[in-house]
Amino acid sequence: MGCFITFEGIEGCGKTTQIKLLEQHLAEKGFKVLLTREPGGCPIADQIRAILLDAANSAMTPSAELLLYAAARAQHVEEVIKPALADDCIVLCDRFTDATVAYQGYGRGLDLDSIGYLNQLATSGLKPQLTILLDCPVEVGLKRALARINGISAGAREERFELESTLFHQKVRNGYLKLAENEKGRFLIVDGGTNVDETRVAVTTAVIGRLNGN
C-alpha cells in the first residue's frame, strides 16, 4: 500500500502552493505520486465542487453543504484515492475529512458526531497517515485569498467561503487547532505565515522523515 498525506488550513494559508511543491520534490526523488483535491478530484466530485464553491449559491443550508461534501468524498475515495494507494502511490490530497469537521462542524456549528458518521461512511474508515496543517492568522490568509480571487475572471471564481465573515474563519482556524491537539501523532502544524521557501523546507523535511519511518 502507498501513503496518504493530506494538507489542511484556512483560506489563503498556502497549502495549495505547498502541496504542489511537495509533489514536485517527491517526483524528483523517484516516488510515485498522485496529487488530488477536495471537493473534486474526479468528474462527479468536480461537478459537486462547482455547486459548493459558487458564490451564487448563498442560500445553501449547512446541512445541504455537509451532505454534498460527503457525496463528493465518497466518489473521490472509491474512484481515485483507494486505487492509487493500492498501486503504491503517495497520495497528496488538498483537503479531506478534517476540513469538513473544521468548516461544517466548528465553522457552521453542525453536530460533530453526525459529521464523524458521514465522514466514516464516505471514506469507509480511510484516514491519512500524515496531515500537514498550514496555520496562519485569519487576516493574513483572507488577504492572500482575496488577492488571488481578484486576479481571476468573475465567471471562474470559486469564492463562496472566502466571502464568509472573519468570525467564521476564526472558528474554522480554532477547529483545526483543536483537531491537531487531539491527534498529535497524525498532525504536523507548519507556520503558513512565513515565506514560501521556509514553509517548503519545513514541509518536505517532515514528509521525508515520515516516509523514512522517523
UniProtKB/Swiss-Prot annotation:
GO terms for biological process: dTDP biosynthetic process; dTTP biosynthetic process; dUDP biosynthetic process. Keywords: ATP-binding, Kinase, Nucleotide biosynthesis, Nucleotide-binding, Transferase. The keyword Transferase applies. Pfam families: Thymidylate_kin. The keyword ATP-binding applies. InterPro entries: P-loop_NTPase (IPR027417), Thymidylate_kin-like_dom (IPR039430), Thymidylate_kinase (IPR018094). It catalyses: dTMP + ATP = dTDP + ADP. It is an enzyme of class 2 (transferase). One of its GO terms (cellular component) is cytosol. ATP binds at residues 9-16. SUPFAM superfamilies: P-loop containing nucleoside triphosphate hydrolases. One of its GO terms (molecular function) is dTMP kinase activity. CDD domains: TMPK. Its EC number is 2.7.4.9. Phosphorylation of dTMP to form dTDP in both de novo and salvage pathways of dTTP synthesis. Belongs to the thymidylate kinase family. HAMAP family: Thymidylate_kinase. This is Thymidylate kinase. It comes from Geotalea daltonii (strain DSM 22248 / JCM 15807 / FRC-32) (Geobacter daltonii). The gene is tmk.
